[in-house]
Amino acid sequence: MSRVCELTGKAVLTGNNVSHANNKTKRRFLPNLCQVTLISDALNQRYRLRVSAAALRSVEHRGGLDAFLIKASENELSMRARLLRRQIVKKTAEAAAA
């Protein structure tokens, strides 16, 4: 399992630990990933995604998974999230036409 957020693309960063004596040692900054189940209102289904805590806050702030994915750019999303986004856009377009 890769350490990348499925919704924002947040991944592992590298840097240095810097001591008081200014000694530098390599380290990794890992994203705060959580396995969560999010509900799509348009599709009436639950989806299990691996997202960062910041992405989870963004989903809540935008009003749910559907609103977040519609506003998100496709190049940040994982392949699963892109497919889900296309399905949501298609379903909302059908609902608007009906």
Curated annotation (Swiss-Prot):
**Any transmembrane segments, and where?**
none
* A biological process from GO: translation
The UniProt entry's GO CC annotations, sorted and at most eight, read: cytosolic large ribosomal subunit
Instruction: One Pfam family, please name it.
Output: Ribosomal_L28
Which keywords belong to this entry? Answer: Ribonucleoprotein, Ribosomal protein
Superkingdom as given in the UniProt entry = Bacteria
Matching entries from SUPFAM superfamilies are given as: L28p-like
Q: Does the record's keyword annotation contain 4Fe-4S?
A: no
| Molecular function per GO | structural constituent of ribosome
Q: Where is the signal peptide?
A: none
Provide the family line: Belongs to the bacterial ribosomal protein bL28 family.
Q: What is this protein called?
A: Large ribosomal subunit protein bL28
What organism does the UniProt record list as the source? Rhizobium etli (strain ATCC 51251 / DSM 11541 / JCM 21823 / NBRC 15573 / CFN 42)
